[in-house]
Swiss-Prot record:
The modification Cysteine methyl ester is found at C194. InterPro entries: P-loop_NTPase, Small_GTP-bd, Small_GTPase, Small_GTPase_Rho. GO terms for molecular function: GTP binding; GTPase activity. Belongs to the small GTPase superfamily. Rho family. Gene3D superfamilies: P-loop containing nucleotide triphosphate hydrolases. Inactive GDP-bound Rho GTPases reside in the cytosol, are found in a complex with Rho GDP-dissociation inhibitors (Rho GDIs), and are released from the GDI protein in order to translocate to membranes upon activation. It is a peripheral membrane protein. GTP binds at residues 13-20, 60-64, 118-121. This is Rac-like GTP-binding protein RAC1. It comes from the Eukaryota.
Amino acid sequence: MSASRFIKCVTVGDGAVGKTCLLISYTSNTFPTDYVPTVFDNFSANVVVDGSTVNLGLWDTAGQEDYNRLRPLSYRGADVFILAFSLISKASYENIAKKWIPELRHYAPGVPIILVGTKLDLRDDKHFLADHPGAVPITTAQGEELRKLIGAPAYIECSSKTQQNVKAVFDAAIKVVLQPPKQKKKKREAQKSCSIL
C-alpha cells in the first residue's frame, strides 16, 4: 500500500465567523458552546475521499487584526484554503474580497480556495434575527456571486452546530487538490508560455 498524500488545509476568515467551530465539528462531531478565539490545535488524520486515502492536515488561523503579521506564517506550504464568512455577517462577507483575497493572493498565489458560508442554521432563525437586528443574512445567490468574483472552484454553506454540509466542505477541499479544475491548468499553461516568451 502506498503512502497517503499529505494535504495542508488552512482555514482563513474574519474573527468569530466559526472557523474553529467548523474544525472541531469536523474532527470530533461536537459543537463548542463557548466562544474562545482560536484554540484548535493543528490536526492530522487519514481521510478517504473517492477511494483515495489522504493525510489531511488542518491548520486554524486567527482572523483578528492583532494577528495580521503572524497569520501568514501558517500559509507556507498550504495546498488549499477554506475561506470562511458568516452567513449572518455582511461585514465578514465583504471582507472576503476586501481583505482576505488580497492577503491570500499575496502570500500564497495560485493555491485553491474553497469559499464557505458558516452559521447556516442561523440565517433563517427568526428568534436569532429578532435578537440581533444588525445581522444581515447573506443569500446563497450572493455566496455564488462572490465565488465567481474570487474565482473559487466551490462555494458551500454549512452549519457546524447541526453538522449540515461540514463533511462536504473538507471533501471539496481534498478534491480540489487531488483533481484540480481544468480551467486553472489552462490559465497556468498560458502563464507559463507567456513567461517563456
